[in-house]
Amino acid sequence: MTEEEKKRRPLVHHIRKQSASKSELPASQRRHAAGLSSRAQGERHGEKTPTNNQDSRQRRRVSFDSNTGRPAPKDHKPIHAGSASAPAGSSLNQPRKTTSQRQRTNSRTSKTTVEPLRRAHPHNPLPNQHPVTNQRNNRRNNNRTAGGQSSNNRNNNNHKTNASQNGTGRFGGALASGNNSARNNTRRRNQTTTAPGTHFVSGPARGIRRKSGPKGSKKAQRIAAAAVSKNRQNERKEQPLPKVLEYRLGMNVQDIAKIIHRDVTEILKKLFLLGVVVNQNQSLDADTIELLAADYNIEAKQKEEVDVSDIDRFFDKTDNDIDQSKLVSRAPIVTIMGHVDHGKTTLLDYLRHTHVTEGEAGGITQRIGAYQARLHDRLITFLDTPGHEAFTEMRARGANVTDITILVVAADDGIMPQTIEAIHHAQAAKTPIIVAINKIDIPGVDPNNVINELMKYDLVPEEYGGSTIEVPISAKTGQNVDKLLEMILLQADMMDLKSDPTAKSRGSVIEARLDKGRGAVATLLIQQGTLKTGDPIVVGNTFGRVRTMNDASHKKLDSALPATPVEITGLNEVPQAGDHFVVMDSEKDAREAGESRAKKAMEEERNNGAVVTLDTLFSTMAKRDMKTVSLIVKADVQGSVEALSASLKKIKVEGVRVDILHAAVGAINESDINLAEASGAIIIGFNVRPVGQAKTDAEQKHVDVRLYNVIYDAINEVEAAMKGQLEPVYKEKTLGTVSVRELFHFSKIGTIAGGLVTDGIITSDSKVRLVRDGVVVYDGQLGSLKHGKDDVKEVKKGFELGLTIANYNDEKVGDVIEAYTMEEVKANA
């Protein structure tokens, strides 16, 4: 037994005597005594009781290196006090210190211990000062002190002797005074202080200090941000001031700072010295902005307030508003017009050396096609417009954007209704007309007949002293087509067509559609400027940025010059065909203009709604009494939507009207099916098909979906459906009369009237009218008809019969029964 154990043994014996009665000792000392007793018993049997440090390490199943404080390998053996492997002079071979000695030592070394710990690298700590060891020891000392403080509060007067005796034992600090607690807490805070931006990690690797964030401490981030801000301020100061400060009302200090390249703080200081106290977000008036500009010795000029939504102002510019020095020659824009099937597309097909006509439904053009052809290294832009009467608006659009109109007239047909309409459109647009008399390859045709007819519409040929160029051609064989192109270039040279490629690009929408994968797709014809990919653009009531741009042959373009037809994507919605487009300064301006135009259009549509007045009351009530055919129109392009909707509205059937609930570009989707189901509408699809779940939904919800690729078929079938909506008109037809002469009453059958057919014929399915003294008593259906005892289908004049009237048993002798039927009168088509 060692000397330390001998010293400890009397204390154990003393505690055993004191614990004979449990009520004599406090709970804290009973726990202490139990711990000492178990320890002494273990040592008496040769068992070595581990210390507190060893207990914690065994519980965690991790051994630590005493020199570094890190987790040691599995084969590492800890060094215990008194072992041969303990280094000389280490704390493990030193005699155990009393509590007062430890406190004096800690108070002397606390200041010198903290500084090396702060400077120590987390992976290479100073000897005997590793964070793990210090943290663990301080935690144990603090717990001992806390236990001693609570014990002294209860037993301050009775156990001072025991506290001094236990000072050198295992629980030496357990009964120390409360003053030690404050010192231990202070020492614990000092020793566990770590460098900024680090923290201790719990677990076996506790004590390894790591960075708290990927970018270091917040202080370093603040310093870096301040440095960047200072660099930006210096860069602004290095930039020269503008000569003129162009401002608009409502600008704030931030807006002014961006224009004159100065810091916001600097401007606020100047305004404060000038007697103006504002913040950076407060709007400045014109006087304040001019005062600030004068302080910077620059001129202030207010911008004119321009309505960004008024894009039509760009098309109202005269020759005086255009810089003539920047104008260059451009390709002529030629529109091919004429009656249906007169050979417009065939002519263009020959020019392009493609076969467009064969691929078009019904062999007719149903949308505007924009293409380019080359002759003698010069480009000509062609627009092919439909000739059917339904496409009046599309022909008008083609005439409004064109330089020259090619009027195609078939030599065998002559002047037709759409030919006359095309002439009027071209004359209204004030464009020169070149007449192409087509189909001269047909035997027996005479082009002079066409020339004589055209003179009635002020189209006088040059040989008769007029200015109209006329060229007989054959689009099928190509005869005289080159001569026609030469006439086009000659006319273009006479017109001296020029444009400014450096101006803001503007033009018109030829066609628009909704593509499933690409979104809104618009075919544009550039009239001024150069359109580039990425330009912010306003198209009618829509806006966006040019995402992609292709030419007529689907080749991708980065830029397009005037008179070039292009197909673009990137718009937020499908625009209307015929709308103008303009490139804006920024996407913000484009968005503002597009949204403003859309809002105005919505307000105009709302204001143009039908208002019922005394003057229109009768017609409004008449419309409400009419049968309605509700339609939903979906087509592939905007021009087809307009043409089909206008044609359907023109169908006139007395008593029935067309109500188009919805007309849009794109495939038939689930929303269209739901709308049709709710409103009982018929869906008309033109060159489109149901997509996704729409087809299945239409079958399940019994929605009528009609699909067409020729406009004639759509119009004819809708007209037939409208005629079918009329209520049939019936006319009464008298069949015969019966004079009642005798009555037979049966309990199960009722009253049977016996009589004689005095006129006509009585059938078993006829309606009957009971007349008594010239007054109709009952009008209903014949119940049964008998001749003798047999049921018969009819009884002719002069024969007796027996009959019953359904739901009526009050016949009397002398009544007259009239038999009649209702026949439907066919409505006139």
Swiss-Prot record:
Its main location: cytoplasm. Residues 474-476 are annotated as: G5. SUPFAM superfamilies: Initiation factor IF2/eIF5b, domain 3, P-loop containing nucleoside triphosphate hydrolases, Translation proteins. PROSITE patterns: G_TR_2. InterPro entries: EF-G-like_DII, IF2_II, IF2_N, P-loop_NTPase, Small_GTP-bd, T_Tr_GTP-bd_dom, TF_IF2_bacterial-like, TIF_IF2. Residues 8-19, 207-221 have a biased composition (Basic residues). It is found in: Cytoplasm. Keywords: Cytoplasm, GTP-binding, Initiation factor, Nucleotide-binding, Protein biosynthesis. The keyword GTP-binding applies. Residues 329-498 form the tr-type G domain. The keyword ATP-binding does not apply. Gene3D superfamilies: P-loop containing nucleotide triphosphate hydrolases (3.40.50.300), Translation factors (2.40.30.10), Translation initiation factor IF- 2, domain 3 (3.40.50.10050). Pfam families: EF-G_D2, GTP_EFTU, IF-2, IF2_N. Residues 81-113 have a biased composition (Low complexity). Residues 438-441 are annotated as: G4. Residues 338-345 are annotated as: G1. Residues 363-367 are annotated as: G2. One of its GO terms (molecular function) is GTPase activity. Belongs to the TRAFAC class translation factor GTPase superfamily. Classic translation factor GTPase family. IF-2 subfamily. One of the essential components for the initiation of protein synthesis. Protects formylmethionyl-tRNA from spontaneous hydrolysis and promotes its binding to the 30S ribosomal subunits. Also involved in the hydrolysis of GTP during the formation of the 70S ribosomal complex. This is Translation initiation factor IF-2. It comes from Oenococcus oeni (strain ATCC BAA-331 / PSU-1).
